[in-house]
């Protein structure tokens, strides 16, 4: 799956339709998706602009802690695309799964495990 937000983003966009190219069962397909198809509200690109690495880390922590809004919706849609491909499930189901993983705290726990592992590896250097 390759996606291109029609607002020049290299990911699924919340501010414009997204063009998708996908190979499924050996067949190449092209289609367009919109945030509204997945129950998301369209927003402006400016609402999704990050900041410094520290600010982006804080935004990520807030999303994984349950904060709703455009940033979370962008994370959900793009995580859903990865789940759609990896688990071979419909995008609608992948969106629900991404939301469940965030809402249950499993995504936050996985991030904490990753941070712990990378810190341990850094200490060994």
Language-model regions: role of each:
Residues 1-125:
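Glycine-rich anion-binding loops and their surrounding alpha/beta cores
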């Amino acid at each position: 799956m390759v996606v291109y937000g029609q607002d020049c983003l290299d990911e699924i966009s919340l501010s414009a339709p997204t063009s998708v190219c996908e190979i499924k069962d050996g067949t190449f397909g092209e289609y367009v998706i919109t945030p509204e198809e997945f129950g998301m509200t369209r927003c402006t690109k400016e609402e999704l602009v990050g900041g410094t690495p520290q600010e982006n880390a804080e935004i990520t922590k807030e999303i994984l802690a349950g904060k709703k809004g455009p940033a979370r919706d962008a994370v959900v849609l793009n995580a859903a695309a990865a789940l759609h491909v990896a688990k071979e499930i419909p995008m609608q189901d992948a969106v629900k799964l991404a939301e469940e993983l965030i809402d249950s705290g499993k995504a936050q726990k996985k991030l904490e495990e990753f941070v712990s592992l990378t810190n341990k590896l850094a200490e060994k250097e």
